[in-house]
Amino acid sequence: MGQKVHPIGMRVGIIRDWDAKWYAEKEYADYLHEDLAIRKFINKELADASVSTIEIERAVNKVIVSLHTAKPGMVIGKGGANVDALRGQLNKLTGKQVHINIIEIKQPDLDAHLVGENIARQLEQRVAFRRAQKQAIQRTMRAGAKGIKTQVSGRLNGADIARAEGYSEGTVPLHTLRADIDYAWEEADTTYGKLGVKVWIYRGEVLPARKNTKGGK
């Protein structure tokens, strides 16, 4: 089952937190559509800023958006011009007060979304799919990952019949719930159609904190 289920969804509430941190009853559908609109808008506006995770929190008439990015300077802009413009556009989109937090990704080679995005952009530039995957695997393992698996699927090299081809290095224990596995999929638009890119990165185990009990038990 661990091979089929989404690795992040399987671990939410165990070692992963939710990307949307709010609760609603009657307004649930409205908030969900608003979240989707916010994510779609940010991904479109900051397509070149290496944005990985977008976290959304809500309070009364206030939305807090946390952007995890490998290029915080590009998001902020000169004197904060870019982030101010983005905040204004999100205020207009939602009709609420939007606060933006920018969190820098220190090691982009350990982020599955950014690794997958890099492979997809190379495929669009006609780099050989085997070479793009192997280079990404080498960079990720050098960055300190315990394991990585990649897969590219579609009309590889313009073949008439679509197929999938992948590579892996190290270990990627998908069944282990305490394993910190980052997963992402991306799309590459080529002259022969779309290619799908999947990336799994194993970053080590997350062990639960031990609770101190009285009497040393």
Swiss-Prot record:
NCBIfam families on file: rpsC_bact (TIGR01009)
Single GO MF descriptor: mRNA binding
Protein keywords: Ribonucleoprotein, Ribosomal protein, RNA-binding, rRNA-binding
PROSITE patterns associated with the record: KH_TYPE_2 (PS50823), RIBOSOMAL_S3 (PS00548)
One GO CC term on file: cytosolic small ribosomal subunit
Listed GO biological process terms: translation
Coiled-coil ranges from the UniProt annotation: none
Subunit structure, as described in the record: Part of the 30S ribosomal subunit. Forms a tight complex with proteins S10 and S14.
Residue ranges annotated for the KH type-2 domain, each copy included: 38-106
Organism of provenance: Streptococcus pyogenes serotype M1
Family: Belongs to the universal ribosomal protein uS3 family.
Role noted for this protein: Binds the lower part of the 30S subunit head. Binds mRNA in the 70S ribosome, positioning it for translation.
Name the UniProt record assigns to this protein: Small ribosomal subunit protein uS3
Gene name, Swiss-Prot/TrEMBL: rpsC
